A protein has these predicted regions:
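Short connector loops at secondary-structure junctions
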Residues: 113-134, 282-309
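N-terminal export/assembly segments and adjacent metallocofactor-ligating motifs
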Residues: 1-220, 256, 422-429
């Protein structure tokens, strides 16, 4: 019996953890209706659009495709195994799966010598490179809600892409943190923080780019700015620095995916600010990102290998190349000769257009994008919809369980990868 079915057969709302955003909200529920799944208890646009990708409960189970033609699952597995066995340098991309799927992917990557890079890998590596170079103080959503009295959003307001974020931080509740947006002068005015909240939002504007603003704020916090700059943009940043020092618990929130190229430098400046503040008060950073399984795959690969993504299990050992092993660069340079793409949470991110042999494990809606010769498509279940699973939340230290809403009749990514691994062993024999 699924989470939405009662013993009487009536379909009712059930508690649900939303897998469509790295916040992994678990405070609302889902109803199964004749035409699909309906969100209850929230107006989150990301959750609604994610649920809209799934049709009626009675939808037929789609067939796998080989060269665009329907086939049985075993034929698709055999074709995918032949592609990977013939490849001298495969690329595993997308990586939109849960913990079990990532654990099954790692031994396959080791066997084939694959390079692994998730969708949005550049954003993920911004934070990882800063962490590797200088370390970081980070926090959790619960800590922000219970302790933070000043939240500074860097560059943009997260609620535009994470609609539930400010509610998760307790914004609008009595005695909670103030929100400050650090934003360039050229940016458009921000929308209200939370519907029905009159507190509004404080904005500190600066001229120039975010690199300059982050560096200047770090200098102000460290007390390295003289009086001669007090009347310009540094004056506003100096006032913000004073507020950061006066706060009991300040949190700097940023979205790696919204940072420009070389955004690692901005994150390093933010980490310096947090480190300086922690000498006399409490402060932390909170990066928002790693959705579509990216942070989960990175966590799994790190604990299994000791190295993050953009790593290859080569004959000489593990190679971690955060710049050279960028999926887009590898495809553009034709440095790889086969692509395995995993996208189990929806039709985005779609596999990149390429004439290389492709194996796609994905949401059934991706079938139309995987046609033609040299392609294999295997539809898989979505964790949190058709199967149970686990994902790491954006704050990195919280592993959230996902409960299936219904049985969609599809295999999980972990099951498909396990069968593919066995087929490869048979090919080698």
């Amino acid at each position: 019996m699924s989470a939405l079915e009662s013993s009487s057969g009536r379909v009712a709302a059930a508690p649900w953890t939303c897998p469509f955003c790295p916040l992994l909200c678990d405070s609302f529920s889902v109803d199964a209706e004749a035409d699909g799944l309906a969100l209850r208890g929230s107006t989150c646009g990301r959750a609604r659009s994610g649920l809209a990708r799934f049709g009626p409960v009675a939808a037929p189970v789609p067939h796998p495709l080989v060269d665009g033609a329907p086939c049985d699952p075993q034929a698709a597995i055999a074709a995918a195994a032949r592609m990977l066995a013939a490849s001298r340098q495969p690329l595993f991309g997308g990586l939109g799966t849960d913990v079990a799927g990532a654990r099954a992917l790692y031994p396959l990557a080791c066997r084939t010598g694959a390079i692994c890079d998730p969708a949005g890998g550049a954003a993920l590596l911004h934070g990882l490179r800063a962490l590797q170079d200088r370390g970081a103080f980070t926090t959790t959503l619960a800590e922000v809600r219970s302790r933070a009295d000043l939240i500074v959003c860097i560059g943009s307001l997260p609620s535009a892409r994470y609609p539930e974020f400010l509610r998760r931080c307790g914004v609008g509740e009595g005695g909670t943190a103030r929100i400050v947006l650090l934003q360039p002068v050229s940016a458009a005015p921000s929308e209200p923080v939370v519907d029905g909240v009159d507190d509004g939002l404080e904005t500190v504007r600066f001229d120039g780019d975010l690199f300059d603003a982050a560096a200047m704020l770090a200098a102000c916090v460290a007390g390295r700015v003289g009086d001669s700059t007090a009347g310009g943009a540094a004056g506003a940043l100096g006032e913000l620095a004073a507020r950061l020092h006066a706060s009991r618990y300040a949190v700097l929130v940023y979205e790696p995916a919204q940072l420009p190229p070389q955004g690692t430098l901005i994150i390093e400046a933010l980490n310096r600010i947090v480190s300086t503040l922690n000498r006399r008060t409490r402060a932390a950073a909170l990066p928002l990102g790693g959705g579509d399984g990216a942070s989960t795959a990175n966590a799994v690969f790190t604990w299994l290998s000791g190295l993050p993504l953009r790593t290859r299990a080569a004959p000489i050992g593990l190679e971690h190349e955060p710049l050279r092993f960028d999926a887009g660069r590898l495809l553009a340079d034709r440095a790889v000769d086969a692509l395995l793409w995993i996208a189990s949470f929806g039709t985005e991110p779609a596999p990149p257009a390429t004439d290389l042999p492709r194996v796609v494990l994905g949401h059934p809606g991706l079938a139309a994008a995987v046609q033609g010769r040299g392609s294999v498509f295997i539809p898989v279940s979505t964790p949190g919809i058709g199967s149970a699973g686990h994902l790491f939340r954006t704050d990195g230290s919280v592993l959230m369980p996902l409960r299936a809403l219904r049985d969609d009749g599809l295999p999980t990514v972990a099951e498909v990868l396990g069968r593919l691994m066995r087929a490869l062993a048979g090919t080698a024999a």
